[in-house]
Swiss-Prot record:
PANTHER family, alphabetized: BAX INHIBITOR-RELATED, PROTEIN LIFEGUARD 4
Keywords on record: Glycoprotein, Late protein, Membrane, Transmembrane, Transmembrane helix
Compartments, as annotated in UniProt: Membrane
InterPro entries xref list: Bax_inhibitor_1-related
Organism: Human cytomegalovirus (strain AD169) (HHV-5)
Gene transcribed to yield this protein: US20
Disulfide feature: none
Main location group: membrane
Protein name: Transmembrane protein HWLF3
Family: Belongs to the cytomegalovirus US12 family.
Biased segments, Basic residues type: 36-48
Region span, Disordered: 21-64
Stretches that traverse the bilayer: 119-139, 150-170, 177-197, 202-222, 231-251, 266-286, 296-316
């Protein structure tokens, strides 16, 4: 069998046999490499697998385009790691560690802001409750003041007006000690007069319920965060609880006027709790260090509105019954009895 290869421009035709290899100075034709590749292909297939991947006790090495590849066996399938990839991963781990440190520092700054806000809030709430207790103990003869003066119920609007001012001004609202004490005195006096008209068990119950609601909704604000699904679940649970409470209140044997007062107070408390949750989210995520007083005042106004509404809901039915001529409890003094004795 003869193989004829054609030389290019300056080459001549040469003939050779399969037994004697061709020797010519001409460059090989384009068909020659193809023929050679076809001949060498079976030889390459018959060669033993010369794969560069050679495993030695769970570690296999193979050439990389630039550097060597390293295979490491981990929990089943081996993971392919190049030297450059290893270096990149180490750099990413270092960056991740640095980022976590920065996040920790940022979280610590937020934590200090939270401490400032809630410390100011606790001071305001303690001052208001303490002043109210002093008024309640110092003026027992005015225990029936709210029964004779229905117009005093309008003082419940004091924290609502303060809330309207703070939300209207927004970030332009001043955040200093002067503003803090103005809001503190205005709401503390209102709460103190309201407490004079209430019984001791009603006061203690209002204190406990206000603190419990504040702690609960602050915890829900941390739990819900910015997740809408969680807030939907929280809202559904709260609506079910509210409807259950209203059903029990409406099915009771109380007067229809008392039922109306309880229903209105329940909806008002729900509204204030929603504002409290919103203010708590603002403190958690969007409170700068120079606005701590303003955010603490917002939380304080929300809590005072809830407290006064609870007092009105728990003491309102009794005030209504007293105004209709119902007998007073033992040990309760009224303005009329005091005037008659004098």
């Amino acid at each position: 069998m003869r193989v004829i290869s054609r030389a290019r421009s300056a080459c001549t035709w040469t003939s050779c046999t399969s037994l004697s290899p061709c020797s010519t100075s001409c460059p090989p034709s384009p068909a020659a490499p193809t023929l050679l590749r076809r001949r060498s292909l079976p030889q390459q297939r018959r060669r033993p697998s010369s794969s560069p991947n050679r495993r030695v006790r769970g570690v296999t090495t193979s050439p990389c385009p630039t550097r060597s590849l390293v295979y490491k066996r981990r929990v089943g399938a081996p993971q392919r790691l190049c030297a450059e990839t290893v270096a990149t991963m180490q750099a990413q781990e270092a960056n991740a560690l640095l980022l976590s440190r920065m996040e920790a520092l940022e979280w610590f700054k937020k934590f200090t802001v939270w401490l400032r806000v809630y410390a100011i809030f606790i001071f305001q709430l303690a001052f208001s409750f303490g002043l109210g207790s002093v008024f309640w103990l110092g003026f027992p003869q005015n225990r029936n003041f709210c029964v004779e003066n229905y117009s005093f119920f309008l003082t419940v609007l004091v924290p609502i007006v303060c809330m309207f001012i703070t939300y209207t001004l927004g970030n332009e609202h001043p955040s200093n000690a002067t503003v803090l004490f103005i809001y503190l005195l205005a709401n503390s006096l209102t709460a103190a007069i309201f407490q004079m008209c209430s019984e001791s068990r009603v006061l203690v119950g209002s204190y406990v319920m206000t603190l419990a609601l504040f702690i609960s909704f602050t915890g829900l604000a941390f739990l819900g965060g910015r997740d809408r699904r969680r807030w939907k679940c929280i809202s559904c649970v709260y609506v079910v609880m509210l409807l259950s409470f209203l059903t029990l209140a409406l099915l009771s044997d109380a007067d229809w006027l008392q039922k109306i007062v309880v229903t209105l107070c329940a909806f008002s408390i729900s509204f204030f709790l929603g504002i409290l949750a919103y203010d708590s989210l603002m403190v958690i995520f969007f409170c700068p260090p120079n606005q701590c007083i303003r955010h603490a005042v917002c939380l304080y106004l929300d809590s005072m509105a809830i407290f006064l509404t609870l007092l009105l809901m728990l003491s309102g039915p009794r005030w209504i019954s007293l105004s209709d001529g119902a007998p007073l409890d033992n040990g309760t003094l009224t303005a009329a009895s005091t005037t008659g004795k004098s």
